[in-house]
């Protein structure tokens, strides 16, 4: 339980901020999800794909592996750049665009995969779905004023300051 509460604090909070910032940068997407609330689950997946809250995760190779002509030896440290995978043009068309109708948005790797997949991924998605539902019920628009201040981290992608105006 503690892992769910503490482990997802920064990441879910930063995904919430990214939801606001992304819909500010792509106001047509706010309009789409506002007109069709059934898009909320895909909106959440797309926000998490567009700006994954963690840039990477490091692992240690348990055995020698040959990959794309390179050898990763047992014991080597490997960084999996979620940011890069989620913006891979071979997997996502127009990957730098936030598209709440993206058909393969759930194919992101922001939660990792396999035995190391994020334990709280469904909780995070639920929290973000509730956030979107409540924002759309209460506000006609949320506008970001000025440029948000990003946190200084190569690991966590988020914001330390974001001024907004909330429109009824």
Predicted segments, located by residue:
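Cytochrome P450
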Residues: 1-168
């Amino acid at each position: 339980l503690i892992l769910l509460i503490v482990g997802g604090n920064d990441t879910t909070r930063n995904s919430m901020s990214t939801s606001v910032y992304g819909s500010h940068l792509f106001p047509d997407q706010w309009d789409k999800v506002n007109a069709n609330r059934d898009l909320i689950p895909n909106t959440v997946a797309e926000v998490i794909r567009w700006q994954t809250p963690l840039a990477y995760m490091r692992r240690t190779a348990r055995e020698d592996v040959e990959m794309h002509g390179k050898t990763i030896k047992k014991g080597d440290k490997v960084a999996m750049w979620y940011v890069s995978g989620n913006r891979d043009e071979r997997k996502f068309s127009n990957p730098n665009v936030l598209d709440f109708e993206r058909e393969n948005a759930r194919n992101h790797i922001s939660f990792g995969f396999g035995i190391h997949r994020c334990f709280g991924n469904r909780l995070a998605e639920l929290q973000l779905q509730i956030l979107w539902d409540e924002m759309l019920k209460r506000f006609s628009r949320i506008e970001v004023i000025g440029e948000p201040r990003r946190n200084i981290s190569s690991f966590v992608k988020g914001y330390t300051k974001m001024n907004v105006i909330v429109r009824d």
